[in-house]
């Protein structure tokens, strides 16, 4: 069904998209988002969330995960789980990102996250770009994690899940201080890679990691999309 003519009031709030789709008989509606796309170490995590329209009152503090402090994000994560009809998370390890490229890995993760939801959505909302093969009609929403409740919920689930993984990896690889920078490009992270070399949790297809892995003979061929992505990420701190 073409929803381009669906009216969504500018003051409809964070749940306006979902409510408009449900009114047209297109519920349940799932939101999908990822965390860790821009990191050079650790996994990328994709989450899909279907919110129970009767429990939206539990989500008064819901917002894009990047706008929440770590403490509040953990609390909102619990709120999302209480308000959700279904939640799924897909963890995509660094080796899979190296093998497929970050964009393809992201798309594959989105498809898998939607496919394993306990509730089958009739419509899927994604953040920023369209994704084919989700098993339901879908719509990309620019700045969806700011504007759409189920996408914001997915962003929180993905972020909290990934941060917990990175804190766990910190215990195994304390020299890289993953608990602090979560695998993103920072001066301290680069200094640690320079001193110790990349570990198995680093994405060797990323330019900055490959350059430091080269002396150890670990260089892999780089996809064009990863070269472009990493060029734009040099010196950038966490954004996902």
Curated annotation (Swiss-Prot):
A divalent metal cation binds at residues 33-34, 127. InterPro entries: RNase_HII, RNase_HII/HIII, RNase_HII/HIII_dom, RNaseH-like_sf, RNaseH_sf. One of its GO terms (molecular function) is RNA binding. Endonuclease that specifically degrades the RNA of RNA-DNA hybrids. Manganese or magnesium. Binds 1 divalent metal ion per monomer in the absence of substrate. May bind a second metal ion after substrate binding. It is found in: Cytoplasm. Its main location: cytoplasm. It catalyses: Endonucleolytic cleavage to 5'-phosphomonoester. Belongs to the RNase HII family. This is Ribonuclease HII. The keyword Methyltransferase does not apply. One of its GO terms (biological process) is mismatch repair. SUPFAM superfamilies: Ribonuclease H-like. NCBIfam families: PRK00015.1-3 (NF000595), PRK00015.2-2 (NF000598). The gene is rnhB. Its cofactor is Mn(2+); Mg(2+). GO terms for cellular component: cytoplasm; ribonuclease H2 complex. Its EC number is 3.1.26.4. Residues 27-226 form the RNase H type-2 domain. Keywords: Cytoplasm, Endonuclease, Hydrolase, Manganese, Metal-binding, Nuclease.
